[in-house]
Swiss-Prot record:
Domain of life: Eukaryota
Record protein name field: TBC1 domain family member 31
Gene name tied to this protein: tbc1d31
Function (record text): Molecular adapter which is involved in cilium biogenesis. Part of a functional complex including OFD1 a centriolar protein involved in cilium assembly. Could regulate the cAMP-dependent phosphorylation of OFD1, and its subsequent ubiquitination by PJA2 which ultimately leads to its proteasomal degradation.
Keyword annotations from UniProtKB, A to Z: Cell projection, Cilium biogenesis/degradation, Coiled coil, Cytoplasm, Cytoskeleton, Repeat, WD repeat
Provenance organism: Oryzias latipes (Japanese rice fish)
Gene Ontology CC terms: centriolar satellite; centrosome; ciliary basal body; cytoplasm
Phylogenetic lineage: Eukaryota, Metazoa, Chordata, Craniata, Vertebrata
Pfam families linked to this entry: RabGAP-TBC, WD40
Length: 1067
């Protein structure tokens, strides 16, 4: 085994000496860095051709190894270790690599350029699966699986799972549109790729231990699934029936299965029978899934394997070793011990017989794996060819082949070794089939181009290798141009494919081989077209009936006809049921014998498999049996075929019904017309009609596509227009929003300006209020000085009333203090309406006061000291109380809403009328009382008031204000304390009432009529009656005030829910 050290080279040779034939390991690759440290390789993957593979190490270097050209080169340096690799199946120069930073990148191996970068995983990507069309890819991590579009490199879908369930693997099934997802709870789901609709779920086994699936593998035809995990058991699923068909137990040394890989074969049609199982001990064991036999293994305990990649064609296996190396294995060398012929037998040939009696040579073949024989000597066993007796010259001439070979000698060699040498097999076949090699005739056929029947061959028979696909199309097209029937035969690709694969480098030889096979070994196949050749099937059935009646009876009892157990073998020429080497060995014997040998081989295959066939009873089992490989010794089958050739009676022997071998004519190929021409012509016409319909359909579809493209374009334009309109609308809304914000800011600025104006007005009102208070204080001081002068003058003249006057003054001072406190408390609420109401009311009151003073000064000359002081105090208190009431009520009314003002206007007017009525009644009562007392004490007071007319005028004014207006004002104020609107109107009415009451005011101690302006009084007459009358009047006024206050409280409690409507107070 040659070890190639890559080192720091960017390109070089994979091996420097040609690998030794027979060695299983072609080369071992290692990369050493500085100081002899080995840089470990982590992952490998093959391309679609199978000739090249990528390998990534843990330094982030990715190398491309070309086995066919014996070259390697450094593709790129990523700088970080890769976790998964995969080729892009559509663009073969591109590949995907998952890196340790959880990203997936696409590179071009030729240009070494980054094509795209995909992100979205939050964990390390463990696997990359690419769809067979190359358009989609699935990347899998422990928590999510994501579906990518490789045309746009955009993520289409994402598979999320619960935290309790992890994802093991998600991958595409080959040659289908199905996604298979496997989870950590052993559940397996199948999904439709386009719609992600769940197609089915594989049922979990009801019995047996839980395997905990970790590894999965699918055959190339997508029909079988193998799964394994933490156990030595393998589960084989049939994806068509969705059932667990087999459980295989590996040897006891296997405890955990790390990786599973099917080994492809050229002639199995994708239904691989060999499965490689990589276990925890680092060995990969290859087994036959049908016979459950161990075929061979790679790796050992010393050189353990960590990962494996299998060539798509099944020729090579690349293994990543535990020590960081890469080993390249040859599958052909690994399986040559299985496929080599049995040891040479010593046969005694009598001189009378031309050939040895091969059916009498019996061998015991073991189905188990044979250990590789130890070499005893360096020479192979010598086989001595016995000379045959001389024959006639005519017979020798008949057996002479074009290449100078002798057919009898070739047959003898074949019977001795069982097969022709692989190196010379194609040469021997060309000689046996006497191929004419008509280059001109073949060129005339190929010049006609591809036949219309095989334009869509890749859809029905997809082949990974495009080269092989094109070769098959060319050969089939040439056959269809040679004979029209071959364009209608559906199974012709199955017949031609094995030969196309063998002669893919020489299409003409392949065509002539297939044509020779059809001309000789497919005789009478097309007489019942399009039905199978019933006459040929009957021949095989008669042979089986002659040699094994029990088996034929079993087939008849199960309802199985020859179309089911003979025709599958013939239409595929055994390529489905035999391996490549077995098929080549069989056709070595078929081409060396009469064309009837093929039918005898079918009968021999059926009879050699009699044991498993006798155990089958279902039609599906028989169909599966004759379409898949089985455990069969081909050597024994060939011997049985020879025995049937010699022991079958002449009346049953196919030789009598089939012509002898006839090679193709030289120069031009023979005419092939052994088929019902009318059927072929009818089918040709139908095919042409269908082709025309398809062309019409394609034309209409193209038109529809154009219309659809135009519709899509118009719809895109409309969407763009609406999107633009939407953007414009959004911009307009944004501009409106900006304008609204600006307006809101302007409104806020205006509100701030209004607040500043209100503050200035409030300050102005405060200044005016302070000025007014100073003026009132000055006026009070003047009045106090006047009162003081009056008190001193009266005290000198009225010694007897000192004590009573002092007591009255004290009471009035206490009351004045209380009223002053109340006035100050209420003045604070009436700041906003002082400039509108205060000045006007004050001016009117001042004018009226002056008029009253002037009139009273002329009419009155004096008054009694205690009565005058009481009247002045009461008048002052009343005036201050009225001003404070007006101010407070104005403030309260301004704070009410305008809507409440309109709703309560009627109630206010009613309250005004009632208040006016009460005030008028009270004024009338007081006026009557005043007239009555005036008449009684007129004579006594007249003399006492003469010296002080001005003093009496002040007392009369204050007394008149207090008696005529104070009680109604208090009642009205308490009755409307709930804050009714329209109070300003009430205030104006009160002011008018006050003026009227003041105009109609009559002094209580005046004996003259109201029109009189001057009257003389005396302080000496009727003092006792005046005192008692004054006390009674004050008592009545207090009682009336108490009643009005109680009624106002009741009205205020009711006004909290409804409009206050107080009842008039009776005088």
């Amino acid at each position: 085994m040659e070890v190639t050290d890559i080192g720091n080279k960017e390109e070089g040779k994979v091996w420097h000496r040609k690998p030794t034939p027979g060695k299983s390991v072609l080369a071992s690759l290692v990369r050493t860095a500085q100081q002899g440290k080995v840089v470990r390789f982590l992952h490998v993957t093959f391309d679609t051709t199978g000739d090249c593979f990528l390998a990534g190490d843990h330094h982030g270097n990715i190398y491309l190894f070309d086995i066919s050209r014996n070259r390697f080169r450094l593709v790129l340096k990523t700088g970080q270790a890769c976790t998964a690799l995969a080729f892009n199946l559509r663009r073969t120069t591109e590949f995907l690599v998952a890196l340790a930073d959880y990203s997936i990148r696409c590179f071009d191996k030729d240009t070494k350029q980054l094509v795209s970068w995909m992100r979205g995983h939050e964990g390390a990507v463990s696997s990359i699966s690419v769809h067979s069309s190359g358009r989609y890819a699935i990347t899998t991590s422990s928590d999510t699986a994501q579906l990518w579009d490789l045309d746009t490199f955009q993520r289409k879908r994402k598979l999320n799972i619960r935290q309790s369930v992890g994802i093991q693997k998600v991958f595409f099934l080959p040659l289908s549109n199905t996604i298979l997802s496997c989870f950590s709870d052993d559940s397996i789901f199948a999904w439709e790729c386009d719609t992600l609709f769940c197609k089915y779920q594989l049922p979990l086994p009801d019995s047996g231990p839980r395997i905990s699936y970790k590894a999965f593998a699918v055959t190339l035809d997508g029909k079988s699934l193998a799964s394994g995990g933490r156990s030595n058991l393998l589960h084989l699923w049939c994806l068509e029936s969705r059932q667990l068909v087999r459980v295989i137990q590996m040897p006891s040394q296997v405890r955990t299965i790390r990786q599973l890989e099917f080994l492809p074969d050229s002639f199995d049609g994708g239904a691989s029978q060999t499965l490689g199982v990589l276990s925890q001990d680092g060995m990969m064991r290859f087994i036959n899934i049908h016979t459950c036999k161990l075929l061979f293994h790679i790796g050992s305990h010393d050189e353990a394997i960590t990962a494996v990649a299998v060539n798509p064609s099944g020729r090579h296996i690349v293994a990543v070793m535990d020590n960081g190396r890469i080993n390249i294995y040859s599958v052909q060398n690994l399986t040559q011990e299985l496929n080599k012929p049995p040891p040479a037998q010593v046969a005694v040939v009598s001189g009378s017989e031309g050939v040895p009696d091969l059916p009498n040579l019996k061998m015991k073949v073991r189905s188990e794996v044979l250990p590789r024989p130890k070499r005893i000597s360096g020479r192979r066993p010598q086989v001595k060819l016995l000379s045959l007796p001389a024959a006639s010259s005519a017979e020798d001439k008949e057996n002479e082949l074009p290449a100078g070979l002798n057919k009898k000698r070739l047959v003898a060699l074949l019977k001795a070794f069982g097969e022709y040498p692989a190196k010379y097999r194609m040469f021997v076949w060309r000689s046996l089939l006497c191929l004419p090699e008509n280059h001109a005739a073949y060129s005339s056929l190929t010049d006609k181009g591809l036949h219309s029947a095989f334009l869509t061959l890749h859809e029905k028979y997809p082949i990974k290798s495009q080269k092989l696909q094109r070769a098959l199309q060319r050969v089939l097209s040439a056959l269809a141009h040679w004979a029209a029937i071959f364009g209608e035969v559906e199974y012709l690709p199955l017949v031609a494919f094995p030969f196309v694969k063998l002669f893919q480098n020489n299409a003409m030889l392949c065509f002539e081989v297939v044509a020779t096979v059809i001309e000789n070994w497919c005789q009478h196949w097309f007489e019942y077209f399009p039905n199978p050749p019933l006459n040929i099937l009957s021949m095989v059935e008669n042979v089986v009936a002659h040699h094994d009646k029990e088996l034929l009876q079993h087939l008849v009892d199960c309802g199985i006809t020859s179309q089911l157990y003979v025709w599958p073998l013939l239409e595929t020429l055994f390529s489905e049921v035999l391996t490549r080497d077995e098929w080549l060995r069989l056709f070595d014997n078929i081409f060396s014998n009469h064309p009837s040998f093929l039918l005898m081989a079918c009968a021999a295959y059926i009879i050699c498999c009699r044991e498993p066939l006798l155990h089958c009873s279902q039609r599906q089992d028989f169909e599966y049996f004759f379409h898949h490989r089985n455990n069969l010794d081909v050597g024994a089958m060939i011997k049985e075929a020879y025995r049937f050739m010699s022991s079958t009676p002449a009346d049953l022997h196919p030789r009598t019904m089939l012509s002898d071998f006839t090679p193709l004519t030289s120069g031009q190929y023979p005419v092939f017309n052994k088929y019902p021409e009318f059927i072929v012509e009818y089918q040709s016409r139908e095919r042409e009609r269908i082709r025309l319909q398809e062309m019409e359909y394609l034309r209409e579809r193209q038109q529809m596509s154009a219309l659809r493209a135009d519709f899509v374009r118009r719809r895109a334009e409309e969407e763009a227009f609406y999107a633009q309109q939407e953007l414009l609308q959004k911009a307009e809304e944004q501009r409106k929003h900006v304008l609204e914000q600006e307006e809101e800011k302007l409104t806020q600025q205006r509100a701030k300006l209004a607040a500043m104006k209100r503050e200035l007005k409030v300050k102005e009102l405060q200044l005016l209020d302070a000025t007014r208070r100073r003026f009132l204080k000055h006026q009070q001081e003047l009045q106090a000085s006047q009162i003081k002068k009056l008190d001193q003058e009266i005290s000198r003249k009225m010694d007897l009333r000192d004590k009573e006057t002092a007591t009255a003054v004290q009471d009035l001072e206490i009351r004045q203090m209380e009223l002053e406190v109340q006035r100050k408390r209420l003045e604070q609420r009436l700041l906003k309406e002082q400039q509108h109401v205060g000045h006007k009311v004050e001016e009117e009151v001042r004018i009226k006061m002056k008029e009253a003073e002037e009139n009273l000064k002329e009419m009155l000359h004096g008054a009694e000291t205690n009565m005058q002081a009481l009247e002045e105090s009461l008048a002052e208190v009343c005036r201050l109380d009225l001003e404070s009431d007006w101010q407070r009520e104005v403030v309260e009314r301004l704070q009410k809403a305008d809507a409440e003002r309109e709703r309560s206007r009627g109630g206010v007017e009613e309250l005004q009328r009632q208040t006016g009525t009460e005030e008028q009644g009270l004024v009338n009562a007081m006026r009557e009382e005043a007239h009555r007392k005036k008449d009684e004490a007129a004579a006594q007071i007249q003399e006492s008031l003469q010296p002080r007319p001005s003093t009496h005028s002040d007392g009369q004014r204050l007394m008149g204000i207090h008696s005529a207006y104070a009680p109604p004002g208090f009642a009205h104020r308490h009755a409307c304390s709930a804050g009714l609107k329209g109070e300003s109107l009430t205030d104006r009415n009160k002011s008018a009432s006050f003026k009227q009451a003041e105009t109609n005011m009559v002094c209580l101690n005046s004996s003259s009529p109201p029109e009189s302006t001057s009257t003389a009084f005396s302080f000496c007459r009727g003092r006792t009656q005046l005192d008692s009358g004054e006390r009674e009047l004050l008592k009545e006024i207090r009682e009336l005030r108490q009643k009005l206050a109680a009624r106002a409280k009741e009205g205020s409690s009711a006004s909290s829910q409804t409009v206050c409507t107080p009842t008039p107070v009776s005088p």
